[in-house]
Amino acid sequence: MDKGVYILLLKNNECRILTGARGEISFSAGWHGYVGSALGPGGLSRVLRHFRLNEKRDKRPRWHIDFLLLSPCFQVMRAYCIHTSEKIECLLAMQMTGKVISGFGSTDCSCKGHLFYFADDPHEDILHLVSSISEKEGPSSHTDILVP
C-alpha cells in the first residue's frame, strides 16, 4: 500500500483512560483528530489496522493512539489519508485547529502533540486542510477519505 500521512477522526464520550506511561488522561465528550505517519513498512495499511483494532479491541496497545482505539468510549468515524513519501506529519499537526492534547503521539518529534480535541465535528476543516496540503505536495500526492 502507498505511504503517507493521515488524520484519524474519532468521536467519544466523556471518559478517563489510562494511557500507559503517560498515566490517566481525561477526555471531554466530542471529537478528536489524531495525526499519524504511515511512511514505514506497510504504509497506509496502518489506517486499516486502526479500524480493525477499534472494531475488535483484541490486541495490546503499541502506540499512544491504541489506548483510545481500545476504549469503548472512542469510535473511529473516518480517516483522511494523504499519499506522499514526504515526512509532513508535523506540518499537518501544526496546522490542526483543535485544542492540542499535550505530548500525545509526539514522543519522536518536537511537536506539542498529535492529538487534537474539537467540541463539534471538524470534518469540513480537516477536509480543507488535507486538500490544501495535498495540493502543495504536487501531482504525485492525492487524498482519500476512508470510513470503517
Per-range role (PLM):
Residues 1-2, 7-27:
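An N-terminal domain-cap segment
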Residues 33-38:
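GIY-YIG nuclease signature motif recognition
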Residues 39-134:
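Aromatic/basic micro-patches that form nucleic-acid/chromatin recognition or nuclease catalytic surfaces
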Residues 138-147:
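Conserved short beta-strand edge segments in small beta-sheet-based binding/regulatory domains
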